[in-house]
């Protein structure tokens, strides 16, 4: 695997010098300063590429080229936004950057309720608490019809939890959910959030798939033409939330994408932490079935709690993800490609990490502190080395 590291650009508290010292060779980054929907110019792409290369690294993967909400709702200037997206892909290819991670999650990107969940060892992790999320949706957002998405027990527990919250607790929970986490391209006030949800009131799973198909049928031929590999990121968490449909959550969703546009440019990001939240997702089977189309991997683990919809981010080698079997399947896919004469490695980044040690005293991007990811990268690197030596060195 190619060892990579997500970097949020010049304002990231983790520097490119830090990235290089961590042992990564590739950088995963994006032009976050360019508004959603606008074309990434060759000039801006080359400027960022030069910064990365001057640090002795390569820009391996774009994460992400965001998809404008008009495309997802099939409204407004969606045709222009699609044309802009096509041009951005052409410009990236012209600059030699050919792997693009993206997602099709409506309104919200990845979602957590607690950004400072304290683990028994004193380090901090990200957490999604189903009951706190219900408290937000039922008692703060007050979304009409939300009760239908929860059990009677969850509704009662959410009411109890809300009753114990201080004003600061409520503000923090709201901020965590709607203000935008690292890598998310949208942040909202509560009123803006309600208005954006309203845009989806008539969009169910079938309609969102229809809109996604329009996007794929416009984008994938361009990607194929210029040699770009599109790698869709799964929904996080991988299930409907806030009345919004989610359509990249299961192996059936992956198959639907392939059936809709059967091109090798139409591929996947294997994010084990996102897919792995669902107990019915067999990660190794996903890799084996769609291995030739996996162009990027995010390796992390989560731990489901007593309520199976509540989870926290575990250490990379712990939790519900069998990281050994996952890495073994990825390495096997790389060797399959090598046997076909393809030398390209699959870019891997240690996705998220616990805030720990000296980073507990620093301002960090949630999930993206240096030391926790350094630990994760070292652990995954060790797993890969052991697998390579045990199975492929003869």
Swiss-Prot record:
Organism: Escherichia fergusonii (strain ATCC 35469 / DSM 13698 / CCUG 18766 / IAM 14443 / JCM 21226 / LMG 7866 / NBRC 102419 / NCTC 12128 / CDC 0568-73)
Enzyme class of the recorded protein, top EC level: lyase
Single GO MF descriptor: mannonate dehydratase activity
Catalytic activity: D-mannonate = 2-dehydro-3-deoxy-D-gluconate + H2O
UniProt cross-references to NCBIfam families, sorted A to Z: PRK03906.1, uxuA
Highest taxon in the source lineage: Bacteria
SUPFAM superfamilies (alphabetical): Xylose isomerase-like
EC number: 4.2.1.8
Cofactor field: Fe(2+); Mn(2+)
Pathway assignment: Carbohydrate metabolism; pentose and glucuronate interconversion
Annotated GO biological process: D-glucuronate catabolic process
Role, per record: Catalyzes the dehydration of D-mannonate.
Similarity comment text for this entry: Belongs to the mannonate dehydratase family.
InterPro entries named in the record: Man_deHydtase (IPR004628), Xyl_isomerase-like_sf (IPR036237)
Protein name: Mannonate dehydratase
UniProtKB keywords: Iron, Lyase, Manganese
Pfam families in alphabetical order: UxuA
